[in-house]
A protein has these predicted regions:
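Active-site hotspot residues in diverse enzymes, especially metal/ion-binding acidic/histidine motifs
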Residues: 1-243
Length: 243
């Protein structure tokens, strides 16, 4: 049975309406809830995530995905890239994803982030191919910097979805509070986007203490320290540091 996801969209084309971050987080939560866990209550795995999106219904449109991990992947200029997402007019409703394991190397965190980013494209950019069978779409993930610093709307959307899928606001806040308490670190009341009623780190948190917390949280969620740092900012879990 395929997972059904929904979000505001153009009913004629299937294209997403402009979605605020919180709406993207909500869609990510729908998907995360059904991804099987491989021994961790916090971290997702590449295998489980790919399996979860094999068949989807997105706003009533059936989307299948086919994944390739064994080949090198290049952009239109011939440069090697981390991943490519495509739809093809000959196979409407099928998302074609290639992930370059040779380029990723021994970085399971980078592979997971790349896969989650491409899942964002499946969820938001594949549905129009169902009702527009002549439409071809191609998105390239050139390198790690694309996973937290994109400019195009579709890439920013895929990145925000990826962030909330792998490291959601409330679970991250819960782990942050637990780890800060275990280290005896102070916390303060401040506006945030995480777990209601919980405190956040003060802006005065020492850099070495913050680095240690960030590394521990990265281990909890199976992502990089940089990934966690971005999510802490996005969820405003450090007082005065939200964007």
């Amino acid at each position: 049975m395929s997972l059904a996801l929904s979000y505001p969209h153009d009913p004629a084309t299937g294209s997403p309406q402009p979605l605020p971050a919180e709406a993207l987080w909500a869609v990510a939560a729908q998907l995360r809830a059904v991804v099987a866990r491989d021994g961790s209550p916090w971290a997702l795995s590449t295998h489980a995530l790919v399996a979860a999106v094999a068949q989807l219904q997105v706003n009533g449109r059936r989307i299948a995905s086919a994944w390739e991990f064994g080949q090198r992947v290049h952009d239109a200029s011939g440069h090697e890239v981390l991943g490519v997402f495509e739809t093809d007019p000959s196979t409407p409703g099928l998302a074609l994803v290639s992930v370059n394991r040779q380029l990723i190397g021994d970085r399971p965190d980078l592979e997971l982030s790349t896969v989650a980013h491409e899942v964002g494209h499946i969820v938001f950019d594949a549905p129009p191919s169902v009702t527009e069978p002549t439409r071809r779409y191609r998105s390239v993930t050139a390198g790690p910097n694309c996973l937290d610093g994109a400019s195009a709307r579709a890439e920013r959307r895929a990145n925000e979805f990826m962030g909330a899928l792998l490291v959601p606001p409330r679970p991250l806040h819960l782990r942050l509070v637990a780890r800060a308490r275990s280290e005896g670190l102070p916390m303060v009341h401040a506006p945030h986007r995480g777990r209601p009623g919980s405190r956040v780190l003060p802006a005065s948190t020492q850099p070495d203490a913050l680095a240690g917390l960030t590394a521990a949280l990265a281990g909890d969620f199976g992502v990089s320290d940089r990934f966690i740092a971005v999510r802490l900012r996005r969820y405003r879990l450090i007082a005065g540091d939200g964007r």
